[in-house]
């Protein structure tokens, strides 16, 4: 319960964050200049907190909220095309109770899965600046500390993959320059004396501070509409996750 309460406090800190002036201005712009199809929406217009199961073994790291997806609805991947792919795959693999989410107040619930992002504000052209990524990094580092049962981290896209590796190094993991590639799975361990955010668990082989990182192409329209990422390819990612963590919690 302590971790759950700490996560709630962290979520409040994220929502109230104003570290990046460019992103604050951009959120105000998209809130005040809604496209016709969303004129009736009351935009969230603030940084988005992470969400999911505090006891999750699967941690998903995305890039950033979509301007007219999460920044509109108030929940990551809710109401956009990437979310349609992600929630469908999570539902099929047993991590979500429903295959689609359009609003933050629907009954979607994640089980054994937690979703976060490299940055928590929608950036212009979906391209965060290096300093904006650094401003947001402490939130991810704190999630690493609080999510004590994580066994596998799924990085959606190359930026999320690169920044996840950087963050793991900062909490004591010995990680070489690993190449990004769809479906590539890496096992990394903390260096001797490094701080481990995972608990010791004989079933999960966490006594050595090991965690697995799985990379995938991001389910963005740029990738899905061009065929770079197909439904079977994305489904196989979650089949691999199930093989790695098993069914039991």
Give a label for each model feature:
Residues 2-182, 195-200, 210-246:
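A polyanion-binding, active-site-adjacent surface
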Residues 185:
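Conserved flavin/dinucleotide-binding core of flavoenzymes
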């Amino acid at each position: 319960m302590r971790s759950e309460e700490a996560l709630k406090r962290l979520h409040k800190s994220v929502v109230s964050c104003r570290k990046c002036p460019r992103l604050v201005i951009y959120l105000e712009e998209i809130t005040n200049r809604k496209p016709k199809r969303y004129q009736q929406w009351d935009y969230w217009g603030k940084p988005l907190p992470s969400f999911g199961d505090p006891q999750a073994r699967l941690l998903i790291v995305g890039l950033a909220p979509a301007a007219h997806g999460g920044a509109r609805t108030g929940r990551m991947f809710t109401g956009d095309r990437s979310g349609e792919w992600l929630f469908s795959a999570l539902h099929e693999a047993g991590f979500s109770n429903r295959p689609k989410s359009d609003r933050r107040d629907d009954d979607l619930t994640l089980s054994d899965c937690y979703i976060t992002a490299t940055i928590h504000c929608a950036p212009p052209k979906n391209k965060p600046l290096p300093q904006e990524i650094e401003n947001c990094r402490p939130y991810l580092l704190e999630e690493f500390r609080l999510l004590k049962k994580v066994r596998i981290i799924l990085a959606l896209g190359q930026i999320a993959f690169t920044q996840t590796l950087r963050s793991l190094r900062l909490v004591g993991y010995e990680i070489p320059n690993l190449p990004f590639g769809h479906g590539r799975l890496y096992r990394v361990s903390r260096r001797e004396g490094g701080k481990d955010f995972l608990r010791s668990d004989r079933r999960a082989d966490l006594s050595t501070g090991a965690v697995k990182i799985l990379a995938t192409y991001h389910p963005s329209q740029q990738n899905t509409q061009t065929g770079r990422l197909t439904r079977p390819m994305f489904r196989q990612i979650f089949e691999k996750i199930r093989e790695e963590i098993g069914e039991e919690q």
